[in-house]
Every structure is written in C-alpha cells, then in structure tokens.
Regions:
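Surface-exposed, low-hydrophobicity beta-strand/loop segments enriched in small/polar/acidic residues
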Residues: 1-132
Length: 132
C-alpha cells in the first residue's frame, strides 16, 4: 500500500481528506492508488498517474460508496512495496503501478512512479521510497 512518508516544505505532515464515490461493485483498500473516471474513484492503471491515495476503504457490495482519499501532490513522498526484486532499479527510475494498485513493479517501461530511495530493498515485497 502507498503510505505517506512525508510532505516536504509543509507545516503539517497530514494531507487534507476529500471524499468521492467509488465505482459501483469495486472494492477500495487503504493505501490504494486511484483516479477519477466518469466522476467516480477507480483503481489506477499501471501507466496512469494516480490522482488520489485511499485513506478509507469500501467493500464491493457496500451501499455507502463514499471513500476518504487524499490528493496526490508533487511534494509528497511515499513508502510502497515493490512486487519483484528491485536489483536492476536505481534512484530516479520511473516504475509502473501493480495491478492491485497497492504496490509498484520493477518495470521501468512507461513508468509513472519515481524512485527516491531504494531503502536497501533487495527482494520482492521490500519497501522503497517513491514520489508520484
């Protein structure tokens, strides 16, 4: 999951929550990368730039579809797991988002998430520091 690590040059390290409706029959998890499509939140595609990170959750069959999210801003830095061993990755590489919207891949072709720090990551599931 995308976990906010810090907001650079901000007096408070807490993003302002906003609420949007989730796409019908789609579950959303805390820390998931999201975009608005047709006015509703949906999982971010691998090579799309996330607009929001979920700070609330909703089940696929929940009647209340409103989800708390924070807007993605350029001064935010996140920790996120990588789905494959990041052995060939370097700081500054751009990687894609995994299909679950909660992790990044080690794929740099058409990447949208910039690596800020590898944090000593050497295996799948290890956490790296990124900027969106």
């Amino acid at each position: 999951m995308f976990k906010l690590l810090k907001i650079e040059n901000a007096r408070m390290n807490v993003p302002e929550p906003v609420f949007h409706e989730a796409t019908t029959a789609e579950a959303i998890s805390i820390g998931e990368a999201l975009v608005l499509t047709n006015g509703k939140l949906t999982k971010c595609a691998a090579t799309a730039t996330p607009q929001f990170i979920a700070i609330g959750q909703v089940g696929a069959s929940d009647a209340n579809r409103k989800v708390a999210v924070c807007r993605v801003e350029s001064n935010q830095v996140y920790e996120v797991p990588v789905t494959a061993a990041p052995t060939s990755l370097k700081v500054g590489d751009k990687v894609t988002i995994h299909t679950d919207g909660l992790q990044v891949t080690a794929t740099t072709t058409s990447g949208v998430i910039t690596i800020e720090n590898l944090n000593g990551a050497s295996a799948a599931g290890d956490t790296i520091v990124v900027r969106i």
